[in-house]
């Protein structure tokens, strides 16, 4: 359940039939807690609000044998007004660099080709995220590193430098913008401006002109005007994102934004979202054309929709479709790009 002691106390006193309640910090102790409930007939309520230790032996289920998620930290300290995560996941706790290094090295030794480092805000990793990237880049093997999510207020030139210096780190940054309007960003408690965000983009593109960015956007935040929404539309054209993940604002009970008057109808939010997606479609179609005639290294993750086609993603996290044999699934393939759409690339297998 949510990492909230008050909620647990309410359940304990109100619902006598409930025998077990635990927060996200106690998940690794599930076996022991169940034993207490079943064998000792106890009611167990474990909400550790300030837990600092991380169980490094906790088993993680992997979906496939070539791409793996590796958490480097848990929780969040940012308290964006629309987000419930800090309340349900607790405060930030970081794994040690050595623990992360050992896990990644083990996965690479087992044949994994892609490692995705995870954190609600990897840039606030307490041991220094650029330093962690450089350390992991030293691991021998044919693999690539990705990470998410990044918060613009903590992302700077040191992060971009590490990405560009490390050959195993993908030259792509998913940097959640949420809005291109400064007033809305302030209401969201994001603690950066559109100009701050653009400085990061300009620095990266100054070093590597085709550096890839993707982002998250919220449409119809409480109090947002159409003119402010249009600032976001203009901003995505300015940045030239490869991809955006956009959502209409939805109220989350327990957040600051839930107390704000939501004066925008669901219908209006939907219309704005459609408008935003159409704008991004034009941006993507033009910007992705930069890959035509170039070679991409693609990690093949499965069959395509058409017979005989395969699909995967290049280092910039863009979908690439091409014709090839199923034996390539789970491996890297070099693909010559022949066509660009607004959401994917198409190419021909080299060799």
Regions found by a protein language model. Name each.
Residues 63-66, 76-78, 169, 179, ...:
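Short flexible coil/turn linkers enriched for glycine and charged/polar residues
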Residues 126-142, 188, 249-282:
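Radical SAM enzyme [4Fe-4S]-AdoMet core and its adjacent flexible, acidic
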Residues 80, 100, 117, 147, ...:
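Conserved, mostly hydrophobic/aromatic
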Residues 259-351:
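Terminal RNA-binding accessory module
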Residues 19, 42, 142-143, 211, ...:
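A structural micro-motif
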Residues 2, 6, 108-226, 237:
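Conserved SAM/AdoMet-binding glycine-rich loop
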Residues 85-90, 190, 223, 241:
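Short, conserved catalytic or interaction motifs in soluble domains
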Residues 1-118, 124, 173, 195-206, ...:
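Proteins enriched for Cys/Gly/acidic motifs involved in redox and nucleic-acid/cofactor modification
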């Amino acid at each position: 359940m949510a990492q909230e002691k008050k909620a647990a106390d309410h359940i304990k006193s109100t619902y006598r039939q409930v025998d077990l309640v635990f927060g996200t910090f106690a998940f690794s102790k599930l076996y022991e807690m169940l034993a207490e409930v079943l064998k000792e007939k106890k009611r167990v309520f474990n909400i550790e609000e300030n837990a600092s230790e991380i169980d490094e032996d906790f088993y993680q289920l992997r979906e496939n044998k070539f791409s793996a998620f590796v958490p480097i930290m848990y929780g969040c300290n940012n308290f964006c007004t629309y987000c419930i995560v800090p309340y349900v996941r607790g405060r930030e706790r970081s794994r040690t660099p050595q623990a992360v290094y050992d896990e990644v090295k083990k996965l690479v030794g087992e044949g994994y080709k892609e490692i995705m480092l995870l954190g609600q805000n990897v840039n606030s990793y307490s041991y220094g995220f650029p330093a962690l990237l450089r350390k992991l880049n030293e691991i021998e093997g044919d693999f690539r590193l990705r990470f998410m999510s990044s918060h613009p207020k903590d992302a700077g030139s040191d992060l971009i430098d590490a990405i560009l210096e490390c050959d195993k780190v993908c030259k792509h940054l998913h940097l959640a913008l949420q809005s291109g309007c400064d007033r809305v960003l302030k209401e969201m408690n994001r603690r950066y401006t559109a100009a701050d965000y653009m400085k990061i983009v300009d620095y990266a593109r100054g070093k590597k002109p085709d550096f890839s960015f993707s982002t998250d956007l919220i449409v119809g935040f409480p109090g947002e005007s159409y003119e402010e929404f249009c600032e976001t539309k203009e901003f995505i054209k300015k940045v030239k994102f490869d991809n955006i993940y956009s959502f209409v604002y939805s109220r989350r009970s327990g957040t600051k934004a839930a107390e704000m008057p939501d004066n925008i109808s669901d219908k209006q939010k939907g219309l704005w979202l459609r408008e935003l997606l159409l704008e991004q479609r034009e941006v993507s179609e033009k910007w992705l054309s930069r890959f035509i005639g170039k070679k991409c290294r693609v990690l093949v993750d499965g069959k395509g929709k058409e017979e005989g086609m395969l699909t995967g993603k290049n280092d910039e996290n863009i979908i690439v479709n091409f014709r090839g044999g199923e034996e390539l699934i789970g491996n890297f393939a070099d693909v010559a790009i022949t066509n660009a759409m607004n959401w994917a690339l198409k190419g021909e297998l080299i060799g």
